[in-house]
C-alpha cells in the first residue's frame, strides 16, 4: 500500500516501488463547468455523460439551481440532466451565490449575470477565492455596460452584480485567460449588437466549440483564433454532451510514468484539444516516452489514450504563447524538472501567482523543503535538476494541483513524506489517492 491517511488532512506518502496499469482520469473540469452553464441557459434538456463529480463543478451546479435551473444529482458514473431556462431565464436567488473555491464558476457567472437585466446577484466563495483578482473580468464587462461592485473597486469578492442590457463592441482581454474570454462570450449572447473578443494569446477554446454546438452565432478568426465574434439573437438548444478525461489530471500520471523506475501506464480517454496539449509538447521536448493511441473525436473534442514509459528526461524551457496552453500543468512540470540533469526554465507564468494559491511560491517552498535547487522569479522558476529529493513534511497549502504534484515528487524521494492538506485533490480529482494506491506496486 503506497498511501496511508492518518487524519482528515494528513497523509503518509511512501517512497519507492513501481507504477503500472491503466487509469481513466475524471471528466475535464473546464468542459464540465461549461456543459452545466450552457445547458442551464439553453432551451430544452441537456444530458451530460462523464461530468466531473468534484467540488468545483458542484459549485457551478449549486449556483444554477439557486437561480431556477433544474439539475439532477451529480454522482460518479451517472448521466446528469439539465433542464434549461433559456438565455434570459435565470432568476434572482434568495441568498448569496456561493462559488466555493471555483474561479471558473465566479468568473463565468459574472459574464452571464451582468447581462441579466433587472436582476441583482451577490457572488462570493471561500477564503482562497475571495483573494483572487476579478477586475480582469469586471473591467472588460464594464466596457459593455456592466455594473459590478466589490472590495478594492470590484477586484475581490464578494461581488454585487446589477444586471443590465449590455452593448456589443470590440473588447480586448487583459490576459490570455479562457475564464475571462468565456465570461465575455456569455455576456455577448444577449448584448445589443455584435461583440468581438480579442485575446493577447490563444487560450483554451472549449467555450467556442460548445457554444457553437448549442446554436450560438459565433465565428473564430484572426491570428491563431484570437478574435471571437458573437452575434446575438440566436437561442441555445439543449445538447447531449460527452465529457472527455481531463488532460490536466492526466498530467500527474504522465510525469509519474516517465520518472518512476520501470513504470508503464496507459491513461485512457484523455481530451486532446490543441489548446490544452502544451504539456505533451513539453514532454516531447524532454524526450519522454509517450504514445497517443486510439485517436477519435467525442462531441467535437479530440480524444485519445496515452501510453507512457519510464525513461531519461532532458531539461526544458517554456515561455510565451505555450503558457496559457499548460498553465495548470506548471506545478507538475516543476516536479519533472527536479529529475532532469541540467537547468530548466519557466517564464511568462506570472498568472500562477493568482491561482488557488501563489503556485510559483508554493511549489518553490515545498520542493525546496525536499532538497530541490530552485530560484523563484516574478514570472517563473529556474530549476537545476539532478539533486536527490528527501522525504519530509509537505503541505498542499489547500491547492489541489500542488497536492497531486507533491504526491508524484514523494514517490521519487529518499524516505517517506507526510502531506498536510491532501484532501484538496478532491477539487478536481476525487479518486486520485485511490488510483495512486492501485497503480503503485
UniProtKB/Swiss-Prot annotation:
Keywords: Amino-acid biosynthesis, Aromatic amino acid biosynthesis, Cytoplasm, Transferase. Pathway: Metabolic intermediate biosynthesis; chorismate biosynthesis; chorismate from D-erythrose 4-phosphate and phosphoenolpyruvate: step 6/7. Its main location: cytoplasm. Residues 1-10 have a biased composition (Polar residues). It is an enzyme of class 2 (transferase). One of its GO terms (molecular function) is 3-phosphoshikimate 1-carboxyvinyltransferase activity. It comes from the Bacteria. It catalyses: 3-phosphoshikimate + phosphoenolpyruvate = 5-O-(1-carboxyvinyl)-3-phosphoshikimate + phosphate. 3-phosphoshikimate binds at residues 29-30, 34, 177, 179, 328, 355. It is found in: Cytoplasm. InterPro entries: Enolpyruvate_Tfrase_dom (IPR001986), Enolpyruvate_Tfrase_sf (IPR036968), EPSP_synthase (IPR006264), EPSP_synthase_CS (IPR023193), RNA3'P_cycl/enolpyr_Trfase_a/b (IPR013792). PROSITE patterns: EPSP_SYNTHASE_1 (PS00104), EPSP_SYNTHASE_2 (PS00885). GO terms for biological process: amino acid biosynthetic process; aromatic amino acid family biosynthetic process; chorismate biosynthetic process. The active site is at residue 328. The keyword Methyltransferase does not apply. Its EC number is 2.5.1.19. Catalyzes the transfer of the enolpyruvyl moiety of phosphoenolpyruvate (PEP) to the 5-hydroxyl of shikimate-3-phosphate (S3P) to produce enolpyruvyl shikimate-3-phosphate and inorganic phosphate. Belongs to the EPSP synthase family. Monomer. This is 3-phosphoshikimate 1-carboxyvinyltransferase. It comes from Prochlorococcus marinus (strain MIT 9303). The lineage of its organism: Bacteria, Bacillati, Cyanobacteriota, Cyanophyceae, Synechococcales.
